[in-house]
């Protein structure tokens, strides 16, 4: 067969094959599958914070290493179960001991020994009447600088945070507030508040921040954690901002922003606006269709929201 005929036959074979592949490729519209979106995909901000803004919104609390504790250092007892952590004593009846809400002072430590003959630290506290001993089962070298004792809140830390915050105005970032009776109440988010006081909290959240809504004069409080905890959503950075959050979203209308402040939604809101109002959903399903992208957001309280091309429908 002549060379020119072989080339012609090759072209006739290749061109229909390419055309067929292009036709087959165009048939995959994406309707066949449902894409599962992760929390990382959803949890986006409209405007990323700069390093300076992140630093400005952080609350660095210095660590008072155990090795530096001085006699007289004060601790707030956050729970009556504190009686379970102290060694038995003839000086008091542990069954009837109620220490919650009281302050204990550190009065030093002495070295004991256990079965492996290690010199372990026994920490002493007093309420002015009794001495309470906490057995660490650790040597001096094994005690980390950030060592804490269950149910005891370091009053030096509480007072340090109080000096940093009390009397200042900032912006609250959650609508889950607590009243003076410590019961949950519906609050407002991204509004200016005045910090009135910082007090010791409870066994889960060691810090209690009391504040006043500048616009409504309503008083409330929030529970807060410190660094080194898994409860990141209750840290200072998660609860408060020193800068006006509203200014980071200039394209959001005042009407929509009022919904966000009240933790509400309305049709026509964008996904970012809904996220600002309600937080990140538990999970998201995205379904591409011929008419556009349909997306469903599901929250832990049973609510779900339906978006078309990024706009809330219901």
Model-flagged regions — what are they?
Residues 5-17:
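Bacterial N-terminal signal peptides that target proteins for export
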Residues 28-71, 93-101, 108-314:
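Residues within mature, well-folded domains
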Residues 74-76:
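Conserved long hydrophobic alpha-helices within structured protein cores
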Residues 24-26:
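C-terminal motif of bacterial Sec signal peptides marking the signal peptidase cleavage site
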Residues 86-88:
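A composition-biased, non-transmembrane "mature-region" signal
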